[in-house]
Amino acid sequence: MLVSGRRRLLTALLQARKWPFQPSRDMRLVQFQAPHLVGPHLGLETGNGGGVINLNAFDPTLPKTMTQFLEQGEATLSVARRALAAQLPVLPRSEVTFLAPVTRPDKVVCVRMNYVDHCKEQNVPVPKEPFIFSKFASSIVGPYDEVVLPPQSQEVDWEVELAVVIGKKGKHIKATDAMAHVAGFTVAHDVSARDWQMRRNGKQWLLGKTFDTFCPLGPALVTKDSVADPHNLKICCRVNGELVQSSNTNQMVFKTEDLIAWVSQFVTFYPGDVILTGTPPGVGVFRKPPVFLKKGDEVQCEIEELGVIINKVV
């Protein structure tokens, strides 16, 4: 796989912005590339905004994709813990290209109207059951990749979301057991073509959500034991530096456990599957007048404890 020049550029831009580096002993798993390495590798981000420890250099027997890593469960996680505790060389952030923490999952599950304040924004009742839709895995790109405006849509919108990554296979999972199936959390940008989603040809939710580049993820998969409370995290989105969404995951109608229990009635979850848990208020379509993304815009999606992803619109 060739290293994308666009990814290198945006990673360098992130470094140049001097986001505050927050060193930690939290487990922040990443997929990355570097000019001196062949293909994608697994690593550990050394804190929010830090460099990367090459896990495959620490243990060459480890798989090089996150899905395979998660499939091996505790065996691979224990290796990552040893690597985190060791004094290992760190690749500078400016020398690596961050990929999405999960690529080509079996499924990407999405939830509509899952924030109380987002329901209030639209003056609609809070749903009594989760409203589920999906995005194709081909829409996933890295945390600093570009979002490409498709010629088929004139109304492309932003949505910051908390994403859950599944770590253990399961079906008919009880809510009380659901967190045992979670590997961790990451930041998602659920880019949405509102004209297709809301009007075109009977309201095409799938098509409106699943154009190429419409699902940036990252920067890291933060393991569940590294997140104090996934349902009490500040969540925000900025477009060209302007704060457009600002809320807290405590506004979620259906929490992670409820969503896993509900969806697993219908489908089997596999390691690497991603659940986008809904967006808070402040999206462009409900502004007066509506505002949509245009070429040259820059969208920053941020969640407390998880990090920031930055996507330029082209």
Swiss-Prot record:
Q: Which UniProt keywords apply?
A: Acetylation, Calcium, Hydrolase, Magnesium, Metal-binding
Lineage: superkingdom? Eukaryota
EC number per UniProt: 3.-.-.-
Broadest EC class assigned to this enzyme: hydrolase
| In-chain residues carrying the UniProt-annotated modification N6-acetyllysine | 203, 234
- Matching SUPFAM superfamilies, A to Z? FAH (SSF56529)
Q: Please list the residues that bind a divalent metal cation.
A: 159, 161, 190
Tell me which InterPro entries the record gives: FAH, Fumarylacetoacetase-like_C, Fumarylacetoacetase_C_sf
Q: Which GO terms describe its molecular function?
A: hydrolase activity; metal ion binding
User: What name goes with this protein?
Assistant: Fumarylacetoacetate hydrolase domain-containing protein 2
Native organism? Pongo abelii
Source species taxonomy: Eukaryota, Metazoa, Chordata, Craniata, Vertebrata
